[in-house]
Amino acid sequence: MANFAKPENALKRADELINVGQKQDALQALHDLITSKRYRAWQKPLEKIMFKYLDLCVDLKRGRFAKDGLIQYRIVCQQVNVSSLEEVIKHFLHLATDKAEQARSQADALEEALDVDDLEADRKPEDLQLSIVSGEKGKDRSDRELVTPWFKFLWETYRTVLEILRNNSKLEALYAMTAHKAFQFCKQYKRTTEFRRLCEIIRNHLANLNKYRDQRDRPDLSAPESLQLYLDTRFDQLKVATELGLWQEAFRSVEDIYGLMCMVKKTPKSSLLMVYYSKLTEIFWISSSHLYHAYAWFKLFSLQKNFNKNLSQKDLQLIASSVVLAALSIPPFDRAQSASHMELENEKERNLRMANLIGFNLEPKFEGKDMLSRSALLSELVSKGVLSCASQEVKDLFHVLEHEFHPLDLGSKIQPLLEKISKSGGKLSSAPSLPEVQLSQYVPSLEKLATLRLLQQVSKIYQTIRIESLSQLVPFFQFSEVEKISVDAVKNNFVAMKVDHMKGVVIFGNLGIESDGLRDHLAVFAESLSKVRAMLYPVPSKASKLAGVIPNLADTVEKEHKRLLARKSIIEKRKEDQERQQLEMEREEEQKRLKLQKLTEEAEQKRLAAELAERRKQRILREIEEKELEEAQALLEETEKRMKKGKKKPLLDGEKVTKQSVKERALTEQLKERQEMEKKLQKLAKTMDYLERAKREEAAPLIEAAYQRRLVEEREFYEREQQREVELSKERHESDLKEKNRLSRMLGNKEIFQAQVISRRQAEFDRIRTEREERISKIIREKKQERDIKRKQIYYLKIEEERIRKLQEEEEARKQEEAERLKKVEAERKANLDKAFEKQRQREIELEEKSRREREELLRGTNAPPARLAEPTVTPVGTTAPAAAAAAAGAPAAPYVPKWKRQTTEVSGPSAPTSSETDRRSNRGPPPGDDHWGSNRGAAQNTDRWTSNRERSGPPAEGGDRWGSGPRGSDDRRSTFGSSRPRPTQR
């Protein structure tokens, strides 16, 4: 492998090899450069190298080389310049397509040339033997050999590009474009096998995308752009599948689209949904699924009516007619199902899946056939107004088949309606996404439905009818067709009848007791036997028994009812227990099954991974060996050719041939050949120089002579052209003079007309200018008046705002003065109260001091009689403050007394406290603790407190003054109250 310092050198080397006809060597040189680890950063020359590389790959049909190169180039520019990769891939696809088109244009018999079932399959041995034996050398064979290889290469190109671009968020648009081109290739050349493989490839890519969610640069399907690209690709797939007639693949495409919609939980655009349901109608009609076909048409009608604003009334009527006819085409009976549980489950799963595809989300616990049925659809068409939008013929047909009873003339009523319907249809002008509507496709199904309705109605009025009469009632079919239809109806329990060809009659009614009629027959037979027995053996009278039973009947019924309720509850409980056990067993079995399945899957994945790794390893080793062997063979062949050409000695037979020895020998030979070639080229260049010099010497006089002849010819041509131009100029001048003379006589009229026009336009101009000036002056006056009015309004508003502002300021000042006055009054009141409290406190201190001195005198035990306390004088309330002030002034200073000790009432004060002061003092609670109860001082104070309380509570007791100075015993008790010391002896 040659190592190039710059990529441009490799490109130049490839061009040199191409010029000498060695395209394979040029391709190998570029391949070595692209796959080299030296050039892992993107450069602009690499893009040109890729263009040249792909040109060589296409010319030599080397798809594998192209794939390797594109993979390496994707690694190089994926994170740097994705647009370069897009250009390279587009160039590759363009080259392959052009080559295929060229081959196609060269083939005259295209149909025979393309008559190949599988592009990837080789020719059959039988075809090869036949061509050899028959000596086929004609044009068909040459066309096949010319066109088919290029189509095969183009198909491999599409596969390669899709494999390179798959599951990459940066290459989604290019992936979608490539898939679209591949679909168009399959569509254009009717490649059904390749189309199936292409669908499977795209399906596997999406499955791998969902499987490996941690992949780098993985597309995000929740993004609107990515989802739209994937949906567009699937819709292209669906369209091509229907156009190619691959209905099974079309149905799988529908499932792919539904899977995408479920995966991202987002509804596509209405235009895509219309295409989706239109293709569903075609698929279900081809598969004879008339029920789902009708529901798909109903969905399509709803979408067109709700989202297509340009839908004309004619198109709406045609779509509604299609919906109604599709619903009527559904067979009026359900197909009989087998009793196999597996088949029933499969049918239920199929119905559920079909309902989901159509857009009806059913619960798995409900049967799909119960939710999606002919009767439900017809009632919904009537309730949603679809029938009212249909044509009159369809409405009449609906009423005749579904609501009316005409057993004898049903065929004659329906036949003209079907003829009119078969002529209706056409392309929808306002709904281009929908296929062409042909109502005639429903006529056979409607004829079959009419036959079934006729048989059903005839069976209700006849028990036996002749075959000829029945054939006359059914104008659509021969009796053999009617018989086939009736067999299907009898099989599905729609009508009960039997055809007797020997008698030529048709018998209606329940004709046997087998199958489902056995149960009813036995019941009727048992009932008849019971009646006969009752007639033969009448029941004896039971009046006497009833007389004894009736009184206890209510209790018996109540007991029986309770017993039945208890039995019912027991049964329900047992059922619940059984169901719970069954659910538990099923849950355990499901867990075991899931666990076993998980283990099996893990083991299978490990085995597959090991096999894949082993296969990959073997494949790599095999490829390396094959590549080395091919290189050795190529080198050996090239060496042998050169030896033969140069008549050199070949390798000996006994000599060991290895790759290394062949390479060394080949390199030696190449070096020698290169030296010889350089010598030959030098000699050839010298010879060519001599020849070129001689040729130029001989050609010089000839060139000079030709130049002189050319000068003479040019001079003559110039003179002729000059003379012709002068003559033409003279002719034009003469014609202009004649034209001037002809027009000069009209000069006066022209001036008169000009003056008239100017005067008229001047007058009109003056009038318009005057009107304009008046209009402008009027506008100026109006604007001035408006400005004056606006100024006055602004002035008035300012004055009013100023007045309101002054009023507000005055009001605020007044409020502020009032608040200050109230504050001052409150302050004076508080000051007066404080003075009154201070005077009261001083008086209390004085009284307490006086009482203390008296107690001390009493405790000394002197013989002098105790000083009698002065009688308190009662002063009016209004004189409280002056008296308190006088007492405070005359009293000496005393120590501070706490507030809780200030509750005694002064006995020597000149006046009593006011009511407010009394309330305030009475609200004070007793002091905390028990100290004032255990001391002499506390005893005295408590005595005074009790005395004060008696004074407040009422007048003093008889025999003593109001201060309690009564008998001696009372004084003793009062003086010793609350004291722990012994009382002194009184004399």
Curated annotation (Swiss-Prot):
Gene3D superfamilies: 1.25.40.860, UVR domain (4.10.860.10). One of its GO terms (biological process) is formation of cytoplasmic translation initiation complex. Its main location: cytoplasm. Residues 808-987 are annotated as: Disordered. GO terms for cellular component: cytosol; eukaryotic 43S preinitiation complex; eukaryotic 48S preinitiation complex; eukaryotic translation initiation factor 3 complex. Disulfide bonds: none annotated. This is Eukaryotic translation initiation factor 3 subunit A. It comes from the Eukaryota. Belongs to the eIF-3 subunit A family. Residues 872-894 have a biased composition (Low complexity). Pfam families: eIF3a_PCI_TPR-like, PCI. Residues 905-916, 976-987 have a biased composition (Polar residues). InterPro entries: EIF3A, eIF3a_PCI_TPR-like, PCI_dom. RNA-binding component of the eukaryotic translation initiation factor 3 (eIF-3) complex, which is involved in protein synthesis of a specialized repertoire of mRNAs and, together with other initiation factors, stimulates binding of mRNA and methionyl-tRNAi to the 40S ribosome. The eIF-3 complex specifically targets and initiates translation of a subset of mRNAs involved in cell proliferation. It is found in: Cytoplasm. Residues 316-513 form the PCI domain. PROSITE patterns: PCI (PS50250). Residues 93-122, 556-742, 797-858 form a coiled coil. Keywords: Coiled coil, Cytoplasm, Initiation factor, Protein biosynthesis, RNA-binding. One of its GO terms (molecular function) is translation initiation factor activity. Residues 808-859 have a biased composition (Basic and acidic residues).
